[in-house]
């Protein structure tokens, strides 16, 4: 009789353990993922807004320019501020519908990414400046074929996505310039033009500025160019972009004015007499990169920050120098530098989470290796975040796993391989996506920063893409609506949500 009682007791214990285990497992399995709400209607309304936007009635052209007669000279601790506009508020859309606009954006985005990857590859492989030195004939005009250079990132096909209005010269002539964290050389189109594309403001005439000075071939700034030549003891420069666009001219210095915030003397900038490419009305480019010729280094800025508004909203924000205001609740990350190339701003990224769960990734997948390859850069000119292939696949698969109940859209659209059909919805709950940075801080993305419309009929795609390179790039779609602060004195990146 004892043996049956033992079996009965064993059965009770086993059943109790089974029920306990099952209960714990069911609680774990029933824990819902974290979600965001995507406003489908609002996003689709903005697709119509940007197509119908009339730049002649926007703040870019209806607001009187600030008086440039009173700004004081800038010192390295002075704050400066500029209004920031998105590219698609700058000129009237030539696209028949939002899908064609999207495809155009993605095409030029691919050109830019290819340029960034190529520039870093040249640096990693140790291409010497002497290998790039052009042969120049004293008797010739500006000939682009005489100035060969590696492909570099920048405003290829007008891919500069954000603009500010800057004054150049004395008296200051205002003009719109592309802002680019992936470029160092500042340049504008100049008279006389061997070949100039159309811009919205008159082309700058250096003879109209009392502070304009051509730089000689022996000037220290000339030796800092990746590609330079000499003619009549004037330093010539060339910058080339991913699609074959370029600017060629002489390197000079002049006064640069930031509205009424202040002005800076003797800024080195290219005066481009031969310029080719669709730069969308901008007069040139203001380089915000980490190299010595960038405006940030020339003005000895201790910090700069920007907040990128939604490209489809038609609104503006600001670019601020020397006004760090990081709060305790803001996400921060290490600002890292690549010893092989100083242009780009690398950020310490450790991974992602989807629906509140960390995505499993190999350690050091986002590190810069000993050769200078890999890592993650923060770039305002790249639109869609690119991830090293293994990281992208893991992130995408985690997102797909939590969206099996959502109606799938087209199998792929350009860069995107994960799309949904939200045409019958006004709002939809989607899993959260967050960046996790080295040091433990994280940034939760709004749903509209990772699910974006690609047409005006309700197709939304997961706004990340893989790259065959080991380099990853955090693009401006994921940055929109977040104040990004580059604290150059402390080597910290700050990310403050909803601070535009």
UniProtKB/Swiss-Prot annotation:
This is Protein ASPARTIC PROTEASE IN GUARD CELL 1. It comes from Arabidopsis thaliana (Mouse-ear cress). InterPro entries: Aspartic_peptidase_A1, Aspartic_peptidase_AS, PEPTIDASE_A1, Peptidase_aspartic_dom_sf, TAXi_C, TAXi_N. Disulfide bonds join 190-193, 196-271, 217-235, 222-230, 307-500, 419-461. Residues 162-496 form the Peptidase A1 domain. Keywords: Aspartyl protease, Disulfide bond, DNA-binding, Endoplasmic reticulum, Hydrolase, Protease, Signal. Induction: Up-regulated by abscisic acid and drought. GO terms for biological process: proteolysis; response to abscisic acid; response to water deprivation; systemic acquired resistance.
């Amino acid at each position: 009789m004892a043996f049956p009682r033992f079996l009965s007791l064993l059965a009770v214990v086993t059943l109790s353990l089974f029920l306990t285990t099952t209960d714990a497992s069911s609680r774990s399995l029933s824990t819902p993922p974290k979600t965001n709400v995507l406003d489908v209607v609002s996003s689709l309304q903005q697709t119509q807004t940007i197509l119908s936007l009339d730049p002649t009635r926007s703040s870019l052209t209806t607001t009187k320019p600030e008086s440039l007669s009173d700004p004081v000279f800038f010192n390295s601790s002075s704050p400066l501020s500029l209004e920031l506009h998105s590219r698609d508020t700058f000129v009237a859309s030539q696209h028949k519908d939002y899908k064609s606009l999207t495809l155009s954006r993605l095409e030029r985005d691919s050109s830019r990414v290819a340029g960034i990857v190529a520039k870093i590859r040249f640096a990693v492989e140790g291409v010497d400046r002497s290998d790039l030195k052009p042969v120049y004939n004293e008797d010739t005009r500006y000939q682009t074929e005489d100035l060969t250079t590696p492909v570099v990132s920048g405003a290829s096909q007008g891919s500069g996505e954000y603009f500010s209005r800057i004054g150049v010269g004395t008296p200051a002539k205002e003009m719109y310039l592309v802002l680019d964290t992936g470029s160092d050389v500042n340049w504008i189109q100049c008279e006389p033009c061997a070949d100039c594309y159309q811009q919205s403001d008159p082309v700058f005439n250096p003879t109209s500025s009392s502070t304009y000075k051509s730089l000689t071939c022996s000037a220290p700034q000339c030796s800092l160019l990746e590609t330079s030549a000499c003619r009549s003891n004037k330093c010539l420069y060339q910058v080339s972009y991913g699609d074959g666009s370029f600017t060629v001219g002489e390197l000079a210095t002049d006064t640069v004015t930031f509205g009424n915030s202040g002005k800076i003397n003797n800024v080195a900038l290219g005066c481009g007499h031969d310029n080719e490419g669709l730069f969308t009305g901008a007069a040139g480019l203001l380089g915000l990169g980490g190299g010595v010729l960038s405006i940030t280094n020339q003005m000895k800025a201790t910090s700069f920050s920007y907040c990128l508004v939604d490209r489809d909203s038609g609104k503006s924000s600001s670019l601020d120098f020397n006004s760090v205001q990081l709060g305790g609740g803001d996400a921060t990350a290490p600002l890292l530098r690549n010893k092989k190339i100083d242009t780009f701003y690398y950020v310490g990224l450790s991974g992602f989470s989807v629906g509140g769960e960390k995505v499993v990734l190999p350690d050091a997948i986002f590190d810069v290796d000993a050769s200078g390859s890999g890592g993650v850069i923060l770039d305002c000119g790249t639109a869609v975040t690119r991830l090293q292939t293994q990281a992208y696949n893991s992130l995408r698969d985690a997102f797909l796993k939590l969206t099996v109940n959502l109606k799938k859209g087209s199998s792929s659209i350009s860069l995107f391989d994960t799309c949904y059909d939200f045409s019958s919805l006004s709002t939809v709950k989607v899993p959260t996506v967050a960046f996790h940075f080295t040091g433990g801080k994280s940034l939760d993305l709004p749903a509209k920063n990772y699910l974006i419309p690609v047409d005006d009929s309700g197709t939304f795609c997961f706004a990340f893409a893989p790259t065959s390179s080991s380099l990853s790039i955090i693009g401006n779609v994921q940055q929109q609506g977040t104040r990004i602060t580059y604290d150059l004195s402390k080597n910290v990146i700050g990310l403050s949500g909803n601070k535009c």
